[in-house]
Structures are given as structure tokens and as C-alpha cells.
Amino acid sequence: NAIPLNGFETVQPIYQFIKYLLKNEKDLQIDSEHMMVISPDEGGMGRAVFFANVLGLDLGMFYKRRDYTRIVNGRNPIVAHEFLGSSVEGKDVIIVDDMISSGESMLDTAKELKRRKARKVFICTTFGLFTNGLSKFDEYYENGIIDRVLTTNLVYQTPELLSKPYYIDVDMSKYIALIIDNLNHDSSLSDLLNPTKRINRLLEKYRAGER
């Protein structure tokens, strides 16, 4: 009962993340000397590699060292986040992941990056659930550990979340509508699924001072 894989497409909202980040942040230098992409764990490396390649940035990764002798809340607890990559000192970092559940792992990653003297920390995830509430994110923002949190509107966003000064709502409505329209007209999805050209145009406008 194997499901054929060739009928599935991976849709990455990278263009939308960059678009909304640049819209809300001025004077970012998007090059390998001033910015890095970070994967919070080994499972998200494919996503982060794509993100880094499209933007022409260096990549760093954390792996979770776990205590396999104990189980806490149904999981082996994380003992430490070990970092693999070049120095983040003085650089802006973009942490890329698919989901924020409780956010504990993401915040631990941000804290470790700040300990390593990263400049600004931006968190980009497709689905933001925030199952443990927003108090920890508030605390980390107030303490200067995180600067922005970007999640899409593909899941419900509470009014409380939308009101946070650090939160950026990444609207996917137009992109999803274009995908549906192309499918209904049997058109190619290639240009929609590969955002490189659109991102390059966006970066050119940003660097030229256009918003």
C-alpha cells in the first residue's frame, strides 16, 4: 500500500518570510558576512540548506544531545544544544523550522545564539501553535534574546499573538490562491515552487532603498 511520492510537491514559504522580514526590518545586510541561517536541529537541515542557498548565506546547525536514560513528558529530555558552524558573533541570524509547538526548543536555540554573541535573532516557522502560551516569548523579547517571530496564517492566530510587538504575521493567502489557480488551469507550478528569481528581485529593491 505504498503511496506514490511523485504526486506531492514541497511548498516552501521562503519568499514570504523574506518579504515580511524586510518589510518590518530596516538596514539588514543580507550577505554571508553579516547574516546566517540556523537549523535548530538535524531534522530541519534540508529546509535550512534551501533557505541558505537561496539567500547566499552560510549555514549553522544545532543538534540536540538527549538523556536517553530518562523520559519526561513522553520524551527523552534535552541535555544540551550543540552547535555546528562558523562563528555567529556580530551576525544577524535567521532560525528556520517548520513548527513552533511549545517553543521551548526554539527559545533554547535563540538563547544559545545570543550567548555566542549573535546580533539580531529572527525566528521563522510555518506553523505557530504556541501551546504553552506566549509568556516565555514575551520574556525573551524583553530580555533582548529574540527580535522577531514570523509565522504564517496557515493556522489560527490569536488576537493576543497578533498584538505582540515582536510578532510578524506572514500572509500566505495570495500564494495559496496562485497555487490553486495554477492547478485548476493545469499550469506548471515550477515558478511558484522556486522563489529564487522573486527573492533576488526583492533583495535588489531592498538594497536600493525601496520598500
Region roles according to the model:
Residues 1-211:
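PRPP-associated nucleotide enzymes
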